[in-house]
A protein has these predicted regions:
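Flexible, processing/modification-adjacent segments and terminal tails
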Residues: 2-73
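Broad, structure-driven detector of short, well-ordered beta-strand segments within folded domains
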Residues: 1-2, 82
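Gly/Pro-enriched, hydrophobic low-complexity segments
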Residues: 60-152
Length: 152
């Protein structure tokens, strides 16, 4: 089976539209590539980032970075927002999943481990995001747990 233009194959999809196995592989590949390469991905040519007003959540104030990706980088959406804690770690990552009808998501990376001097979140939870920017606590849309991270 082949999917020559995977992104175009999602035209007209909503969150409820079923995906083929190849569409799932495309999305999972884009998602994990983005998740594992941030913040280094931000150094790529054509990506723009601008600090915007801070955000209060869970008794903390997080700095926010509005990021715009060029068309040549396959990712969830052109416009994304990163939330950075006082320790410099990514606390939240917002995006609208363009291939699923621009479904808004609030992604929470946590449980960081250090591998060869680089911090990686081993737990990721993604929830629907409301119009006011606040996450819904249910339903849990995506759950990712990583272990045994090795850099070669």
């Amino acid at each position: 089976e082949e999917l020559p233009d995977p992104r175009a194959s999602f035209a007209g999809h909503t969150l409820e539209t079923p995906w083929t196995e190849l569409q799932l592989a495309y999305f999972a590949g884009c998602a994990m590539w983005t998740y594992l390469t941030l913040p280094f991905l931000l150094a790529e040519p054509g990506i723009t980032a601008q600090e915007i007003e801070p955000w209060e959540e869970s008794g903390e104030q997080w700095r926010r970075l509005a990021v715009t990706f060029p068309a040549n980088i396959a990712t969830h959406s052109t416009h994304q927002t990163l939330y950075i804690g006082n320790d410099g770690l990514l606390r939240r990552h917002d995006y609208d999943v363009e291939i699923a009808g621009n479904t808004p998501g609030a992604h929470y990376p946590s449980d960081y481990v250090e591998v060869q001097g680089i911090r990686f979140p081993t737990r990721r939870r993604i929830y629907p995001r409301q119009a006011d920017g606040k996450p819904m606590t249910e339903p849990l849309v995506v759950s990712i747990d990583l272990g045994d991270i090795v850099l070669r």
